[in-house]
A protein has these predicted regions:
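Non-catalytic helical/linker scaffolds that mediate oligomerization, partner binding
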Residues: 1-484
């Protein structure tokens, strides 16, 4: 059985070689992530080209996700490269201090408005929360703190404020330039780092569209303010990514698991996509097998209903990138066999405003109550397939479309598989036969299998799906005994 949960893999030095990319695609990567926090534009352009070329060579469609860096809120560099802070030490972050002249007592910062964002009593977390600094006072450009959790601090480590409250804009000048590159490479998804509200998401979408970008917008949930505004952010986005690293620093690591479950639940209820990310198989950067805790983490994300799970450093710079993808694939497949992963009561008690949405829900209800082998969703935009994918089921959904952008988009939808399909006839019976023939060619159905076909009366019309047909492969005259 095909895996329903999608795998997003970050491409970096460990995986940019075409031969390694071949192995990633063969092992099951659905979407490649390009992290614009690192490397030059031409490097990312080449990686996107390679991913698409190798996917095509394997007869597959792969999505490309561009991840913007967002605001850099970091300490500067130290003269000696690093220092060690002990509990009780006085330490100053000075917005006017030279960025490359950090000492044991003082360091500069890339975030020049830090003194305006904090006051006495605030807690600053450095290096993903490994070091905690209690703010005693703010004097001019100096944030004067006392170390409450010590440790080693090296160049360019991040700064977070416990509970949120740093006012840095979600989109920087670098991000605006990167958005134009993302549009030029026809990114299927654009991820915004550190959005605080729907306004940040809308601004990114406007800039992306103005640059010619057609892909979906991913809101990375990694600020405390984003959690407070989560419903409006989900509504404004196409996808939400639960970026658990910075999020855990701001709200506390113990708060992340219930927030993760809530975000996934809300995203599915709003017919949006959810990606679970950060440290999913972190140990595999060095080791060839995951820890038991990592296996449980991936499996629980699948059982929560996440559409996709993401690998970051594991595939970007890890020693075992292909093994990491294989491990994630294996864990997802086993988790998907559990009852809660294939059954759903999503929206059973709600009414619908659109015919195509009602058809999608009716299709999944029928598929889950008859021995249906596959669903062929003839689609222009992929909307019908998206709505279907919100219903937990073991029945695969094939999005048949002539639009390459739609095929790439659905690579992130749980349980949906893209298929290139051209409608060459206006006769509905002929279209149905062609759709079934395509499923037969893929090896997913054979004579005697039951399938569901959804389509519209008018081809080429967005939102035009208004028909659902239950059909038998091979045109058998009646249902099999098990379906009666």
């Amino acid at each position: 059985m095909q895996r329903r949960t999608k795998i997003v893999a970050t491409i970096g030095p460990a995986t940019e070689d075409p031969k390694v990319m071949d192995k990633l695609i063969e092992t099951g990567v659905d979407v490649v992530r390009l992290n614009f926090s690192h490397d030059k534009h031409e490097v990312h352009i080449k990686r996107a080209e390679t991913a698409r070329e190798r996917a095509q060579a394997h007869g597959r469609t792969i999505g490309v996700l561009v991840d913007l860096q967002g605001p850099k809120i970091r300490v500067g560099k130290f003269k000696q490269g690093k220092i060690h802070l002990n509990e009780g030490d006085k330490f100053i972050i000075d917005a006017d201090h030279p960025l490359d002249q950090g000492t044991q007592e003082r360091v500069g910062t890339t975030y020049k408005t830090l003194p305006q964002d904090v006051s006495r009593g605030a807690t600053l977390l450095l290096d993903d929360g490994r070091i905690a600094l209690w703010v005693e006072q703010v004097e001019g450009t100096e944030v004067i703190g006392r170390v409450v959790v010590g440790g080693e601090l090296s160049d360019n480590k991040g700064i977070n404020r416990q509970g949120g409250g740093l006012s840095a804009a979600a989109l920087t000048d670098k991000d605006r330039a990167d958005i134009k590159v993302a549009a030029a490479i026809k990114a299927d998804y654009l991820a915004i780092s550190f959005p605080r509200s729907a306004a940040d998401v809308n601004e990114a979408r406007e800039l992306f569209r103005a640059a010619g970008g057609l892909g979906g917008i991913v809101a990375k949930i990694e600020r405390a303010e984003a959690v407070e505004n989560i419903e409006e952010i989900i509504r404004a986005s196409d996808v939400v990514m639960i970026a658990r690293g910075d999020l855990a620093v701001e709200i506390g690591d113990a708060a992340v698991p219930p927030i993760q479950k809530r975000i996934i639940r809300l995203a599915r209820a709003m017919n949006k996509i959810a990606i679970t990310a950060t440290q999913m198989l972190e140990s595999m950067i060095e080791n060839s097998v995951p820890t038991r805790a990592e296996v449980s983490d991936v499996a629980n994300a699948v059982l929560d209903g996440t559409d996709a799970v993401m690998l970051s450093a594991e595939t970007a710079k890890g020693k075992h990138p292909v093994a990491a993808v294989a491990a994630m694939d294996r864990v997802c497949r086993v988790a998907e066999q559990e009852y809660e992963a294939t059954h759903s009561r999503h929206r059973e008690d709600q009414t619908f405003r659109r015919v195509d949405e009602a058809i999608a829900m009716a299709t999944m209800y029928t598929a889950n109550h008859l021995p249906v082998r596959a669903i062929a969703a003839l689609t222009e935009s992929g909307a019908t397939a998206l709505w279907m994918s919100r219903i937990s089921s073991s029945v695969p959904i094939y999005a048949l479309t002539s639009h390459v952008e739609t095929r790439r988009k659905v690579t992130l939808y749980r349980g949906v598989y893209p298929v290139a399909f051209e409608i060459t006839s206006s006769d509905h019976a002929e279209i149905n036969r062609s759709a079934i023939d395509e499923l037969r060619r893929l090896g997913t159905v054979r004579d005697g299998d039951m399938v569901i076909i959804t389509k519209g009366d008018l081809t080429g019309v967005l939102g035009g799906t208004n028909a659902m047909k239950v059909a038998m492969v091979g045109n058998l005259p009646e249902f099999p005994e098990s379906a009666k």
